[in-house]
């Protein structure tokens, strides 16, 4: 693997392992409330078909004031940190993951994000969102936070695939040019962009998935970070109902590792890898069941 993992990059940059604090902004998504539509005009409700009721943020707490969320998240994370690291020397990423964390007026999010990034032990603000929910005032707000606090601001965009057909099938709710416009404006603003891709979406073959990766490899400016996630079929999702009615192919661990190797060969060496698999809750996982054995998966993917 020519690329570096984000954990390695952060440890080198900050001199210690950096831990994510899963936070909630209390937002929803435009394809959950009928704002988005398919090309035929059908209004979308319920979100992307693979997404659970937790908005793909099962480890985030329900919305409460951000300072309280940070302390609650630290209580969950700190037991994993070696006791030899003093509490004052611990470093964190404030990660707003669930749903679309820029869906609404920029000022609604400014206070929350500022409370997070201003925390003395937070080294980066990470915001999960959609490219169709990034008006210029929101991009300016994120840029101003980066400049004011001198800390990293990451924007994670859920692209999933470049296939128009798959995008309709999973109810993504926006077209590829929308992503391209958001990517350009975010990078022009000096913000760090991480793109989230899901592998083995229904109807996609190997070449379809590699087409998405080649697209990312050709982005200009070059892509800073990528999350490659195996599709997890989670209980209670629209995709779970689709899978149970007509199961589609999901890979073995070895097949998945082989595809990842090819994906990484295509991506630029300077692209930082933030994820190589999924991390859904075991209690909701329907398939593939091997994905629940996190230790086995990590060991298999360690030497890609």
Give residue spans per PLM region.
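Structural recognition of alpha->loop->beta junctions
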Residues: 48, 116-122, 211-226, 298-304
